[in-house]
């Protein structure tokens, strides 16, 4: 059985990693995440670390994962909030998953403007069609928090 340690991180260049996470990372061999995640955490990785970029098509990434019994994955914010942990659970249902979440960007926004997070309708356009956003607008949802990507931005 494969084990995935999925660590949620922020976009901050100065990452706060708990002692438990730093210890896990120092003992790790195989790491994965997006290019941006690698830029943010490379200084914490062991010198002989193997890095697997998370890129599309994901089948290629998961083929590389098959070679390793333990993988430490860095993901944005809360890995279960429209995140990569959901993909791992869907593609590898028998894998053991240990999560270390942090705040996601919409939680950070809500905290900054003192908005109770549960009052916000949240949706993701990351790699998804516009349908959910269109539906929220048609329903007249008052507060909509939207996760975007490089293709679906507030300007598009």
Where are these predicted regions, by residue range?
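Class I S-adenosyl-L-methionine
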Residues: 1-100, 107-108, 130
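Beta-strand/loop-alpha-helix module characteristic of Rossmann-like adenine-cofactor folds
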Residues: 2, 7, 107-156
């Amino acid at each position: 059985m494969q084990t995935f340690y999925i660590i949620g991180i922020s976009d901050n260049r100065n990452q706060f990693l708990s002692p438990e996470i730093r210890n896990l990372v120092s003992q790790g061999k195989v790491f994965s995440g997006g290019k941006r995640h690698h830029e943010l955490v490379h200084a914490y990785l062991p010198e002989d670390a193997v890095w697997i970029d998370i890129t599309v098509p994901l089948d290629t990434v998961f083929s590389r994962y098959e070679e390793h019994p333990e993988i430490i994955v860095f993901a944005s914010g809360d890995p279960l909030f429209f995140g990569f942990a959901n993909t791992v659970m869907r593609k590898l249902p028998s894998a053991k998953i240990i999560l270390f979440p942090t705040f996601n960007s919409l939680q950070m926004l809500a905290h900054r403007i003192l908005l109770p997070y549960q009052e916000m309708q949240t949706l993701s356009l990351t790699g998804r069609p516009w349908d959910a956003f269109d539906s929220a607008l048609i329903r007249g949802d008052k507060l909509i928090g939207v996760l975007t990507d490089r293709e679906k931005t507030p300007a598009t």
